[in-house]
UniProtKB/Swiss-Prot annotation:
UniProt superkingdom: Eukaryota
Region ranges (Disordered): 41-120
Family of the protein in this entry: Belongs to the immunogenic miracidial antigen family.
Biased composition range(s): Acidic residues: 45-66
Protein name, per record: Immunogenic miracidial antigen 5D
Length: 120
């Protein structure tokens, strides 16, 4: 029995589990809940007034990038999406909640792109 074949089977199972976890977290009402604001805000323009009542992407604040506040799926899968005003970056696999100005029209319920690793 080929030893490398065992590793291949294990790897395929592992990848399948990751894909299952990703799709589950994207559709879970708990993991895709709105981001909780820390009350801190660095103004990035008049596109987002953080009064707590509107559909604002709090992950676009510079002070939230290294802050452990965000949707649980972001924390579980790693990686915040930095706002385009500050250079953007790679879309990490996981949940991304678009803000009002750059939103995709779905109110932040769906990821910006359906493939992981999409780059601007």
């Amino acid at each position: 029995y080929n030893h490398s074949h065992i590793h291949t089977q294990y790897f395929v199972t592992y990848v399948s589990f990751l894909l299952l976890f990703t799709s589950t977290s994207l559709n879970s009402p708990y993991l895709s809940s709105p981001v909780i604001s820390t009350g801190q805000h660095i103004d990035v323009g008049d596109e987002d007034y953080h009064d707590g009542d509107d559909d604002v992407d709090y992950t676009d604040d510079v002070d939230d990038v290294d802050d452990p506040h965000g949707s649980p799926s972001q924390l579980l899968q790693g990686g915040y999406q930095r706002n385009r005003h500050y250079g953007g970056g790679t879309y990490h696999s996981g949940y991304y909640r678009p803000n009002k100005q750059h939103g995709n029209g779905y109110g932040g319920q769906y990821p910006k792109k359906y493939g992981s690793g999409y780059k601007h």
